[in-house]
Curated annotation (Swiss-Prot):
<keyword id="KW-0663">Pyridoxal phosphate</keyword>
<dbReference type="GO" id="GO:0030170">
    <property type="term" value="F:pyridoxal phosphate binding"/>
</dbReference>
<dbReference type="InterPro" id="IPR001926">
    <property type="entry name" value="TrpB-like_PALP"/>
</dbReference>
<comment type="similarity">
    <text>Belongs to the serine/threonine dehydratase family. DsdA subfamily.</text>
</comment>
<protein>
    <recommendedName>
        <fullName>Probable D-serine dehydratase</fullName>
        <ecNumber>4.3.1.18</ecNumber>
    </recommendedName>
</protein>
<dbReference type="GO" id="GO:0009097">
    <property type="term" value="P:isoleucine biosynthetic process"/>
</dbReference>
<dbReference type="InterPro" id="IPR036052">
    <property type="entry name" value="TrpB-like_PALP_sf"/>
</dbReference>
<dbReference type="GO" id="GO:0016836">
    <property type="term" value="F:hydro-lyase activity"/>
</dbReference>
<feature type="modified residue" description="N6-(pyridoxal phosphate)lysine">
    <location>
        <position position="116"/>
    </location>
</feature>
<dbReference type="Pfam" id="PF00291">
    <property type="entry name" value="PALP"/>
</dbReference>
<keyword id="KW-0456">Lyase</keyword>
<dbReference type="InterPro" id="IPR011780">
    <property type="entry name" value="D_Ser_am_lyase"/>
</dbReference>
<dbReference type="InterPro" id="IPR050147">
    <property type="entry name" value="Ser/Thr_Dehydratase"/>
</dbReference>
<dbReference type="GO" id="GO:0008721">
    <property type="term" value="F:D-serine ammonia-lyase activity"/>
</dbReference>
<dbReference type="InterPro" id="IPR000634">
    <property type="entry name" value="Ser/Thr_deHydtase_PyrdxlP-BS"/>
</dbReference>
<dbReference type="GO" id="GO:0036088">
    <property type="term" value="P:D-serine catabolic process"/>
</dbReference>
Amino acid sequence: MKEIEALKEQYPLVNNLIATEEVFWVNPNMEKYETAIKNSPLNEEHVKDAEERLKRFAPYIAKVFPETKETGGIIESPLVKISSMKQSLEKNYEQPILGELLLKCDSHLPISGSIKARGGIYEVLKHAEQLALQHGMLTEKDDYSILDSDRFRGFFAKYSIAVGSTGNLGLSIGIMSAKLGFNVTVHMSADAKQWKKDLLRSKGVNVIEYEADYSKAVEEGRLQADADPSCYFVDDENSHDLFLGYAVAASRLQKQLEELEIVVDEEHPLFVYLPCGVGGGPGGVAFGLKLLYKDNVHCFFAEPTHSPCMLLGLMTGLHDKIAVQDIGIDNVTDADGLAVGRPSGFVGKTMEPFLSGNYTVSDEELYRLLKELADTENIYLEPSALAGMIGPLNVCKAENEYLQKQQLTEKVKKGTHIVWGTGGSMVPEDVMNGYYKKGLELTCK
């Protein structure tokens, strides 16, 4: 307990976290891009390598997932302006949002309907490629659509893949691994939604359920893989491959911004708000964006008030050496994708010099925002995907120290805010109706 008292004294915001209040934190350790990138374990070459690999797999993806045919086997999501939602937020919060507001709809990514379709699918594809190359069954010059054959499925069936997940990562790893022919086991934490487990089982995935939280599910997945040399473990807490799969999103987003004639430069800053669980998804996307836009992009992570693991790890500098449970927070939230008590140390340390800040949002707020987005834009997201939505309001507050510190108070008016909508299109209709109803009840209170 002594250590916790010392933390509270050193970082007064810890008291607000313990009280599960909504907070906004500006990262004092952010550095200029050129300084930060020099010490980074990853760089542009790593992201380019991931991009090339996804291009090699595109013919296979287009063949086995017809919903990606139109995009030539590239798994990508729309970027849309949400002007009606912007007006609604300004009215409800009695505060202007300076600049344009857009939504990146990773909720509608093909195959698994969430941001995890980026990193999760990429890591499985990379593993499959390595196995096939090692065994002389494939060369990088081949048309990868040959993977859709009994020969390859029979080969991959000798191997297994394991992952621990609160839901969405399990969906992407499970669906992709099963499609290739791997034996796949998803270790699901207590907060994983039933429909996600049902969907995985319908695809032939072995789902193991736990009463404990996310960290336990990951630990069990790791143990399974350790005991079996033919089993590959997708390590959501430490994986560079997952991170790089997410980072590829940046160059795709750049093209979409250009198509919308949206400029990003020193006079037109870009602000991006990313829901954060263990950190891989938002960390990878933010890293990719920093590589492209350097000091002209400002990335913020958003977490539930009951699971602020990354904020706690970054603020105290303890990273994965501290969990929210250590300071008495229960890690119980309806934002199942973000219900993580201990952050990734790899992501925290990698992103510390690049990240602008972090904030928390209550479950009640997520439901209200869910209902509002459905009403104004007819876009339905799952609760955790709405965490980014109050980011622009936080940043545009008159007293926001970040804008002042970065001399953006005037520039923000010509800037762009992108809220990353991380999941939702695969939520069954009855479940989504329940979410909407809850949002309606909370709005009427």
